[in-house]
Swiss-Prot record:
Cellular-component GO terms for this entry: cytosol
Organism superkingdom: Bacteria
Protein name according to UniProt: Cysteine--tRNA ligase
Binding annotation for ATP: K276
Length: 472
């Protein structure tokens, strides 16, 4: 089957052809670590983790790099406000980010480089751009000559005149006096105050601009040309536009083959973008105190990555209901695999499995159409639940179905591994006593034991195949 990916650069779906057969190189812009990430930030992390997992499901070896921006204006301002250093602030929120993403079952990136650990490489990169005539220095600041790059504006589908008009409205007097053109952007920023974090450079003490950091880290760890560069739609311009200009000016090679951008998280009836500037955000750190991380993860994975997702309690409840359905199906499936009933081949179920697998791959190969894929998963559980009601089941087919469902759920970061606890043996004894009471029609004792089990958080299910239990 042909996998197709929507490329922001060309505004169309394209067949995915990796640079190296069987391998995928991915760079996804990570957070600026001056605070906890909010759910809008998490959308990108979850979306590209799901994409990465699907590539791995399809047999690709994925090298996934996602950076930490640990120095910029926001970092400096927040550190001053909290009377700490930029480095301490970064360490604190990188730790928080890793804890939040671990809770959401995000696979750690192959590499998580930090901008401040790449300063010499950044300086060398900037100097190369100056030597090639793509950059110039003014009073310790270094700017990129945007007009010199012939395709500037192509990614965001803007022409130079539009860009200049927009830039002129936002440029301050100091920048206007330094820049050759309003659309030029900073590669290196001179130190303004003695207490401001800075490094020695050929242009004096200063620090890197935001855009140059990702150009340096992506080319250093993945090469001059990479398969996929991802991030939120708000990074399309200026961040990713500037990355292209910097990287291709330096290397003379195509920077990225497939640009991918995820949609926003919106909130409320007006469906405003969730953002810190609008004060309408919820941090992952806070929301995970209230809901199961797996529910949030699944909810955020349930909409195709390019589409916006409107965050709501109803959406979370619906995601929780669907997850419980999958969990119950797998529990019932396990119970039937362990019962003593003889197996009976079911050609219809086997055909359903073959068809479902093909349709799931077809959906995900179409620019990661998770909505269609999840619909196929849901229909398969319906077929399985019907089959599980029969006196005799096709156990080889059920084993295959279990393996398939678990693999699909893993793509969405969902795992139902229920660890055995110390009192499981005690629960088994109580369930056996209740079964005995039911056989003897001692309904009072049966009800007493059921109530006692429920008080321990145990759910009892009486089926034709016997009693099943699980934790609520």
């Amino acid at each position: 089957m042909i996998m197709k990916v929507f490329n922001t650069l060309t505004r169309q779906k394209e067949e995915f052809k990796p640079l190296v057969a069987g391998k995928v190189s991915m760079y996804v812009c990570g957070p600026t670590v001056y605070n906890y990430i909010h759910i809008g930030n998490a959308r990108s992390v979850i979306a590209f983790d799901t994409i990465r997992r699907y590539f791995e499901y399809r047999g690709y070896d994925v090298k996934y790099v996602s950076n930490f921006t640990d120095v910029d204006d926001k970092m400096i301002n927040e550190a001053r406000k909290e009377h700490t250093t930029v480095g301490e602030l970064a360490d604190r929120y990188i730790k928080a980010f890793m804890e939040d993403t671990e809770a959401l079952n995000i696979e750690p990136a192959t590499l998580h480089p930090r901008a401040t650990h790449e300063i010499q490489e950044i300086i060398d990169f900037v100097q190369d751009l100056i030597d090639k005539g793509f950059a110039y220095e003014v009073d310790g600041d270094v700017y990129y000559r945007a007009k010199k790059f012939p395709n500037y504006g192509q990614l965001s589908d803007q022409n130079i005149a539009e860009l200049e008009e927009g830039a002129s409205e936002h440029i301050n007097e100091e920048e206007q006096s330094k820049k050759e053109d309003p659309i030029d952007f900073a590669l290196w920023k001179a130190q303004k105050d003695d207490d401001e974090i800075a490094w020695d450079s050929p242009w004096g003490k200063g620090r890197p601009g935001w855009h140059i950091e990702c150009s340096v880290m992506s080319t250093k760890y993945l090469g001059d040309t990479i398969d996929i560069h991802g991030g939120g739609q708000d990074l399309e311009f200026p961040h990713h536009e500037n990355e292209i200009a910097q990287s291709e000016a330096k290397t003379g090679k195509k920077f990225v083959n497939y640009w991918m951008h995820n949609g926003f998280v919106t909130v409320g009836k007006k469906q405003e973008k969730m953002s810190k500037s609008l004060h309408n955000f919820v941090t992952v750190h806070d929301i995970l105190k209230q809901i199961d991380p797996q529910v949030l993860r699944f909810y955020m994975s349930s909409v195709q990555y390019r589409r916006p997702i409107n965050y709501s309690e109803d959406g979370l409840k619906q995601a929780e209901t669907v997850l419980k359905r999958y969990q119950n199906t797998l529990r019932n499936l396990d119970a039937r695999l362990m019962d003593e009933q003889e197996t009976l081949e079911d050609s219809i179920l086997r055909d359903n499995l073959t068809q479902a697998k093909a349709e799931f791959i077809e959906a995900m190969d179409d620019d990661f159409n998770v909505q269609n894929a999840l619909s196929i998963m849901y229909d398969l559980t319906s077929n399985l639940n019907t089959h599980l009601q029969k006196n005799q089941v096709d156990k080889p087919a059920l084993k295959k179905a279990k393996k398939l469902l678990l693999a699909w759920l893993e793509i969405f970061g969902v795992s139902f591994n229920e660890k055995q606890t110390e009192n499981d043996d005690e629960i088994e004894v109580m369930v056996a006593k209740r079964d005995e009471a039911r056989k003897n029609k001692n309904w009072a004792e049966s009800d007493r034991l059921r109530d006692e089990l429920q008080a321990k958080g145990i759910v009892i299910e009486d089926t034709p195949q016997g009693t099943r239990w699980h934790r609520a």
